[in-house]
């Protein structure tokens, strides 16, 4: 969230057992793919198999500590019989080689966002309409300067129905549009304006590997509080 606290997304609970090396995620029954189908623990197993197979090791370091992961990548067995990631009913279980206190934090990073057909995302500009992924929004249109997100039918109706992500030519242009009410949120406004925005109660700072600032328009017609909370999580995972 906006305070940097870990919040549940797909799982309603996580139990850590066996001296800290086994994680049991109980998957919620109210989480859905962007096409409206329910997300299951088996879906997550398939996703982890895909990214372990297709992604660079440096990008998925957390999975390199999963029991059997390196053996699988060295062609020493198939995924199901070698890698300690499996489903039991609607529970996803992951067993590590050794304790990793940062494991859950690592899994919250963007590269672990649940999606189908991982390789297809390399060509997102051409096939975004056919991509399937988790989350409250789906991409309805996109071009070089703008992405339009629409709320999924089964998502919470308290969050905004449509989000427009616009790439302005400069920080100053973005802030100017914000000041006249044409932007609800500006990410990384000009540094010389940070103190003023903070004093006006319009600035939040998100924890990250590098500093990320966001300025929120406080107009009553702008994004409501529940919508802001959702945007916090989207920005934090970007």
Outline where the language-model segments fall.
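Periplasmic-binding protein-like
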Residues: 204-238
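Gly/Pro-rich hinge or "lid" segments in bacterial periplasmic/extracellular proteins
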Residues: 95-158, 162
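Ligand-binding "clamshell"
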Residues: 194-207
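Aromatic- and charge-enriched surface segment that lines or borders ligand/interaction sites
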Residues: 13-62
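Ligand-site clamp/hinge motif
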Residues: 151-195
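N-terminal lobe/hinge region of extracytoplasmic solute-binding protein
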Residues: 1-18, 49, 132
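Surface-exposed binding/hinge segments that line
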Residues: 15, 60-117
